[in-house]
Amino acid sequence: MSNVDRAEIAKFEALAHRWWDRESEFKPLHDINPLRVNWIDERVGLAGKKVLDVGCGGGILSEAMALRGATVTGIDMGEAPLAVAQLHQLESGVSVEYRQITAEDMAEEMPEQYDVVTCLEMLEHVPDPSSVIRACYRMVKPGGQVFFSTINRNPKAYLFAVVGAEYILNLLPRGTHDFKKFIRPSELGAWSRDAGLQVKDVIGLTYNPLTKHYKLTSDVGVNYMIQTLREA
């Protein structure tokens, strides 16, 4: 059985044409992207690395990593976002290979092929996040690193990521997130360790509605990223 939620894909299919509009529903992704790319680049040195971006959507992260000198492949199950990603790279001149395939199927094809695997803002949109994490482990080379980001599951996250972002500040379309699918850092850490990955670092992202800016922080109460290592 495929680890795909068609309803989740449909949400992003409907908005795909707005993916690269920095004032659209995807503004939060554009706003946090430099912070995320810098954080990853500081830890792995993207230049010259072979990178897989799992759940790449319209290619915002994929292109940013390619601009840092990485050879990037982006995979997603949304046909429309991938079409947007492919069109955008024609405009930008940034080279990324895009494929419509699940992480699990890609792991069958490409085991131990990547220096770095990224899976950002994707785990909370699939039925079985642990299956994706295991696939990421299989695709990264021994000694390589895997980065995940998602949203914590607690009252604060519900208030900020659902009520605040979707209903008050209108940063995201209503219904973008399902609180039940949010993932606690302890759960993500346990799934990562069960897959064979060693957790190296955890960082939070917070949003200030007054300045409309995001920043990296030790507060992992809402949005957070983790760095993991597959030991050599």
Curated annotation (Swiss-Prot):
Keywords recorded for this protein, A-Z: Methyltransferase, S-adenosyl-L-methionine, Transferase, Ubiquinone biosynthesis
Binding site for S-adenosyl-L-methionine: 36, 55, 76, 120
Listed InterPro entries: SAM-dependent_MTases_sf (IPR029063), UbiG_MeTrfase (IPR010233)
A Pfam short name: Methyltransf_23
Enzyme Commission number(s) from the entry: 2.1.1.222, 2.1.1.64
Superkingdom assignment: Bacteria
GO BP: methylation
Record has S-adenosyl-L-methionine as a keyword: yes
Top EC class of this enzyme: transferase
HAMAP family tied to this protein: UbiG (MF_00472)
Protein name: Ubiquinone biosynthesis O-methyltransferase
Organism annotation: Pseudomonas savastanoi pv. phaseolicola (strain 1448A / Race 6)
The encoding gene: ubiG
